[in-house]
Amino acid sequence: MKPAARRRARECAVQALYSWQLSQNDIADVEYQFLAEQDVKDVDVLYFRELLSGVATNSAYLDGLMKPYLSRLLEELGQVEKAVLRIALFELAKRDDVPYKVAINEAIELAKTFGAEDSHKFVNGVLDKAAPAIRPRKK
């Protein structure tokens, strides 16, 4: 699958995870509704599904990975920033096939696209500190 299809999968995952975080609906229902309502022809749907289920299943673990590097409480994070960080941390912790720098750069781009004005700087700061602890030898 092309890198652009993976990028689109991440973009869709941010949107679906945002919905899941706010609604607390079952992730399978969120996935079904998202795929039924959105144009996903240029999306790596398998990767989208993996990101959704992986982040939802591991959300407490992923939150634990980010907490030491946050400048504020986890509960004070914006939902977009939380979704972006969870995706990046999932890729760093569970997807060795995703290069270290790709996971970070994609997260920064997602934060620029979907987050508040300076959220990409916040995401970059957290990941710059967390990533070496997650993948110490894989820069």
Swiss-Prot record:
Signal peptide: none annotated. GO terms for cellular component: cytosol. The keyword Iron does not apply. Pfam families: NusB. Keywords: RNA-binding, Transcription, Transcription antitermination, Transcription regulation. The keyword Repressor does not apply. One of its GO terms (biological process) is transcription antitermination. CDD domains: Terminator_NusB. Involved in transcription antitermination. Required for transcription of ribosomal RNA (rRNA) genes. Binds specifically to the boxA antiterminator sequence of the ribosomal RNA (rrn) operons. Belongs to the NusB family. This is Transcription antitermination protein NusB. It comes from Enterobacter sp. (strain 638). The gene is nusB.
